[in-house]
Amino acid sequence: MFSLMTAWAQVLMASGLFYFIQLPGARSEENCVNTEHCLTTDWVHLWYIWLLVVVGALLLLCGLTSVCFRCCLSRPENGEDGAPPPYEVTVIAFDHDSTLQSTITSLQSVFGPAARRILAVAHAHSSLGQLPSSVDTLPGYEEALRMSRFTVARCGQKVPDLPSVPEEKQLPPTGKESPGTEPPSH
């Protein structure tokens, strides 16, 4: 494709120069009958003007070629783009169970069952140890990576399945059943 575009640009350049040369020449003559074709400058003898035109055309051709070359290189090859997009991780801290329940209820319509699982895991880890009241900031990125409670996946890696946590089983059902009724046994 690159050589085809280069050839096409060269053909356009050559045809443009050919038509420009074919323009009727105007000469500076003292006895000019038709003043429309009479000019005071003889363009053929002004070689520096032609040099500027050719240099400008070559710069234009080089610019067009480099843009096409960059476009061809920036396209991903077939099979390279098959990797899944990078994962995003959101950590949410909760102080009370009522906050957890209201957050699960509001986020479940957006994220579905994944919201319950993520929030249940976050709640299980937050109950392991309470933060001192004097500490208002979250740990830094490097410190969070060193904690053994989290599983970190690099971009492009598949995240391993997490084991179920007890809090996930304690959450109320999301169906239309009321919490006090049990499903009928068969």
Swiss-Prot record:
It comes from the Eukaryota. It is found in: Membrane. Residues 1-28 form the signal peptide. The chain crosses the membrane at residues 44-64. The keyword Transmembrane helix applies. Residues 158-186 are annotated as: Disordered. One of its GO terms (cellular component) is membrane. Keywords: Membrane, Signal, Transmembrane, Transmembrane helix. It is a single-pass type I membrane protein. InterPro entries: TMEM52 (IPR038942). This is Transmembrane protein 52B. The lineage of its organism: Eukaryota, Metazoa, Chordata, Craniata, Vertebrata. The gene is Tmem52b.
